[in-house]
UniProtKB/Swiss-Prot annotation:
Gene Ontology, cellular component aspect: cytosol
Domain of life: Bacteria
Sequence similarity: Belongs to the UPF0301 (AlgH) family.
Pfam families linked to this entry: DUF179
Highest classification ranks of the organism: Bacteria, Pseudomonadati, Pseudomonadota, Betaproteobacteria, Neisseriales
Alphabetized HAMAP family for the sequence: UPF0301
Protein name: UPF0301 protein NGO_0569
Length: 182
């Protein structure tokens, strides 16, 4: 099972302080573990702070976007999920058209026409060790659904959790993750 380019959608009763009502975009999943970016948790960092560090202006298309809190790991670093993939110093391809980049060069070029079409900027990331995500899935902590670029890039972050459930065709209020466990 490879969940790269999928959303993890937290079950409604998840109690973890960070992951409660989270949608995590899985960027890499293999036998060694998984890495993803939470796409619906705003961070205290502003776009002004990010772009002033690069000496570039915030692109008009991103002026009202929030910087996401991608996860609790390496919160001092920035990560960009973007299209097209491009040729950056430190990127991993997630799908045919989406990449995760952690190098500054993508931020420095984001306002250049044609360099980056769509982008979600985050600080930190989420990770799971070998077998950990599979155990959490078996414990009914998460639902999975193939990623949707519209949810990832176009829908306001506060609506992404509901949109991911809608893509699954499920009403989150009707779910109880403890079903089937004695």
């Amino acid at each position: 099972m490879n969940l790269s380019n999928h959303f993890l959608v937290a079950m409604p009763d998840m109690e973890d302080a960070f992951f409660s009502q989270s949608v995590v975009y899985i960027c890499k999943h293999d036998e060694d573990g998984a890495l993803g970016i939470a796409i619906n948790k705003p961070s205290p960092i502003t776009m002004d702070m990010i772009f002033s560090a690069t000496g570039k202006n915030i692109p008009m298309r991103m002026q009202h976007d929030s910087v996401m809190m991608g996860g609790p790991v390496q919160v001092e670093r920035g990560y960009v999920v973007h299209t097209p993939i491009g040729n950056w110093q430190s990127s991993i391809g997630v799908s045919d058209g989406i990449a995760l980049t952690s190098s500054r060069d993508v931020l420095e070029n984001i306002s250049r026409e044609g360099a980056v079409d769509k982008a979600l900027i985050s600080i930190g990331y989420s990770s799971w060790s070998k077998g950990q995500l599979e155990r959490e899935l078996a414990d009914n902590a998460w639902l999975t659904v193939p990623a949707d670029e519209h949810i990832l890039f176009d829908i306001p972050y506060e609506h992404r959790y509901a949109a991911a459930f809608a893509k699954l065709g499920i009403d989150p209020l009707a779910l109880f993750s403890g079903a089937g466990h004695a």
